[in-house]
A protein has these predicted regions:
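A short glycine-rich, Lys/Arg-flanked "PGG" loop and its adjoining helix->strand segment in the class I
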Residues: 71-83
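Class I S-adenosyl-L-methionine
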Residues: 114-140
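Short, charged/polar "capping" segments at the starts of alpha-helices
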Residues: 30-37, 97-99
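Conserved Class I S-adenosyl-L-methionine
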Residues: 101-121
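Short acidic low-complexity segments
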Residues: 45-56
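Active-site-adjacent loop/helix micro-motif of nuclease/hydrolase catalytic cores
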Residues: 61-73
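Conserved beta-strand signature within the Rossmann-like core of class I S-adenosyl-L-methionine
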Residues: 81-92
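Conserved class I S-adenosyl-L-methionine
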Residues: 16, 21-29
Length: 140
C-alpha cells in the first residue's frame, strides 16, 4: 500500500485499533477498501463483510448519508459491537468532492444520542475520515 503524501505512515489496521485475533466487520466499504486501503491485518484477525454471529471487536461502517447513519447507528452498536468494542463511522471528507451531509459533528451528535462517545479520529484515506465511537465504561 502506498501512503499518500501528507498521511501518517501508520498502517490503517493499527490506526483502527485492530489487534491480533479480533473479529472485524466492514460494512458498505468502497470498492478496493480491503485490498488497496486496509492493508495487511494482524495475525488471527477474522474479517467479515456481512454481519453474522456478533459481537465484533471492531466494526467499520461507511456512511455518506446522515439519514442512513441515524437509522442504523443504534443497531450497529446494540447488535454488532462487543461491549468493549469499537465502532468506526467513516464519512466522505468535504474536500473529497463526494456529495454528503455527513461530518464529524453529525457522527458525534448522533452517537451521543445513541449512548456512545467518540474517542479518536482517523484519516482513512484521501476520501474518507473516521471517528471511533465506544460505549462509556459504566455502560459496558
Amino acid at each position: 500500500m502506498t501512503v499518500p503524501s501528507g498521511y501518517s505512515g501508520t498502517p490503517l489496521p493499527t490506526k483502527l485499533g485492530i489487534r491480533p485475533g479480533d473479529r472485524v466487520l466492514i460494512d458498505a466499504a468502497p470498492p478496493g477498501f480491503e485490498n488497496d486501503t486496509l492493508g495487511e491485518l494482524p495475525d488471527g484477525v477474522v474479517l467479515h463483510r456481512r454481519a453474522g454471529r456478533a459481537p465484533y471487536d471492531v466494526v467499520v461502517v461507511f456512511r455518506d448519508d446522515a439519514t442512513t447513519y441515524r437509522r442504523h447507528v443504534e443497531r450497529d452498536i446494540a447488535r454488532t459491537v462487543a461491549p468493549a468494542g469499537r465502532l468506526w463511522v467513516a464519512w466522505p471528507k468535504r474536500a473529497s468532492g463526494v456529495l454528503t451531509d455527513m461530518s464529524d459533528d453529525v457522527v458525534r451528535r448522533v452517537g451521543l444520542q445513541a449512548g456512545v462517545v467518540d474517542t479518536k479520529v482517523c484519516a482513512i484515506d484521501a476520501t474518507w475520515s473516521g471517528l471511533m465511537l465506544v460505549r462509556r465504561v459504566r455502560d459496558r
